[in-house]
């Protein structure tokens, strides 16, 4: 497992539970022991986290079900209609920026 994935696995649960952009977590999901964070549903593997980003040309929320079928451990979305089995945040783009900053800071402290 690459070092950045190991760091994400070690610190994700603490990060998400204190994240200011968090709206809701499905209590049934296990926030530990995943492979990686993935934004491309075509590349999802079993036990990955799918981050449903939306842009000008696509809406990642349209691919939540596909990512589940491919075996994602859970997903992160800003669409309240997809909360079962996932994490609801204010903005998935801001979440991606914030988790990246968090991991950079954790890496500096090591």
Locations of regions flagged by a protein language model:
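Walker A (P-loop) phosphate-binding motif
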Residues: 100-110
């Amino acid at each position: 497992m690459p070092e950045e994935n190991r760091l994400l696995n070690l610190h994700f649960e603490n990060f998400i539970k204190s994240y200011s952009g968090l709206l809701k977590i499905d209590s049934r999901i296990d926030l530990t022991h995943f492979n990686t964070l993935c934004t491309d549903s075509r590349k999802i593997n079993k036990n990955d986290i799918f981050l449903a980003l939306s842009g000008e040309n696509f809406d990642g929320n349209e691919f939540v079900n596909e990512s589940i079928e491919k075996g994602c451990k859970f997903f992160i979305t800003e669409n309240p209609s997809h909360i079962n089995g996932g994490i609801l945040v204010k903005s998935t783009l801001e979440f991606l920026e914030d988790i990246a900053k968090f991991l950079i800071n954790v890496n500096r402290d090591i």
